[in-house]
Amino acid sequence: MSATGQPDNAIQMGFKPMLPGFDYAEYNNLEDFKSKVTENTIAIMIEPVQGEGGVHPATQEFIEGLRKLCDEKDMLLLFDEVQTGWGRTGAPMAYTGYGVKPDAVSMAKAVGGGMPLAACCATEKVAKAFTAGTHGSTYGGHCVTCAAGLASVTEILDNNLS
């Protein structure tokens, strides 16, 4: 909730104080993102397609620029695909249409086929930080939700629904 691009909104009500250290930049504005990067910046997290208040896809130039910036500054590029993942944009993940690989991607909603399920996929380098006992999930590993997730993803992939 600290990372939401809509600070001080209803999503955060009742949950303060938020974690410090988050900064926000204008979507699709690479120069604004660059201006916010400091020696303490470790990652940039965005939605490849923003879904609140309409449908707002990132430009190709913006996504490619973020990947280049993160590579140059040794930062992680994180994609939030909770709204757009698993076929909701006509591709398995919205980011796949950009030809840019994130360091990690979060997904939910469609991945569970209506059941409460979420996932985080990461590169091997990033995944090494997730050691046993350091990352938890409310619904992690539940047999019913995992079966629903497997069925949902299988249906999407086997029937070319993305």
What do these predicted regions represent?
Residues 1-162:
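Conserved N-terminal phosphate-binding loop of PLP-dependent enzymes in the Aspartate aminotransferase
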